Amino acid sequence: MAAAVPQRAWTVEQLRSEQLPKKDIIKFLQDHGSDSFLAEHKLLGNIKNVAKTANKDHLVTAYNHLFESKRFKGTESISKVSEQVKNVKLNEDKPKETKSEETLDEGPPKYTKSVLKKGDKTNFPKKGDVVHCWYTGTLQDGTVFDTNIQTSSKKKKNAKPLSFKVGIGKVIRGWDEALLTMSKGEKARLEIEPEWAYGKKGQPDAKIPPNAKLIFEVELVDID
């Protein structure tokens, strides 16, 4: 027996609003969409996992498509449903088995490090430690786009190093990964590929173009 046709829960504006969590849209789609529809839009599986991979635009498109195509729960044959579910279950089980492989598949680090000044070689930061750094960031053509090193003596007195928790995504990945290899007092030159910097989008506010390789001189002055 066909299930009752659901009503639209949100307007287009509400769907695109930041106040509406992705998980709510996914739950609605999983509650009301047929399994083949969900499989086609890669929406089957644990809501948390789906939310990690699906962006808001994809969910809005799927939501509108569900009402346009009317492929609601209970609108397709059982054999077709079980086949779709079987396929998705197989795919869902794969990441668990290949998790360690996925890490290996990333290839070499997307940065290179040259030590300019050796550290104490005993105090290394761990994930979640607060690190304190002086730095200068330049583009490949030598343009300085950011620095916290002051040149005038007046400003030098008030200058403070950049402090943040390392290894948890507070900064670009190239920094997170490289700082975990540095010891207290070390100064290094980091050449970071776009994938571990600002990627395809760049950082227009800082005048960093898309796909830019960034060069930083970073000094790790302290670890908490």
Swiss-Prot record:
Q: Which residues carry this modification: Phosphoserine?
A: 36, 152
Quick one: where's region Disordered? 89-113
Q: What is its EC number?
A: 5.2.1.8
Q: Does the keyword Metal-binding apply?
A: no
A Gene Ontology term for the protein's cellular component: nucleus
N6-acetyllysine PTM sites in chain numbering:
99, 170
**Entry-annotated residues carrying N-acetylalanine:** 2
What is the annotated localization of this protein? Answer: Nucleus
Q: Which GO terms describe its molecular function?
A: peptidyl-prolyl cis-trans isomerase activity
Please state how the activity of this protein is regulated. Answer: Inhibited preferentially by rapamycin over FK506.
- Tell me which Pfam families the record gives: BTHB, FKBP_C
Q: Which residue intervals are annotated with compositional bias (Basic and acidic residues) in the record?
A: 89-102
Q: Which controlled-vocabulary keywords does the entry list?
A: Acetylation, Isomerase, Nucleus, Phosphoprotein, Rotamase
Q: Which reaction is recorded as catalysed by this protein?
A: [protein]-peptidylproline (omega=180) = [protein]-peptidylproline (omega=0)
Under InterPro entries, the record lists: FKBP3, FKBP3_BTHB, PPIase_dom_sf, PPIase_FKBP_dom
Q: Please state every residue range assigned to the domain named PPIase FKBP-type.
A: 128-224
Which function does this protein serve? FK506- and rapamycin-binding proteins (FKBPs) constitute a family of receptors for the two immunosuppressants which inhibit T-cell proliferation by arresting two dinstinct cytoplasmic signal transmission pathways. PPIases accelerate the folding of proteins.
What's this protein's family per the entry? Belongs to the FKBP-type PPIase family.
> Could you identify this protein by its name?
Peptidyl-prolyl cis-trans isomerase FKBP3
Its source organism is Bos taurus (Bovine)
Gene responsible for this protein: FKBP3
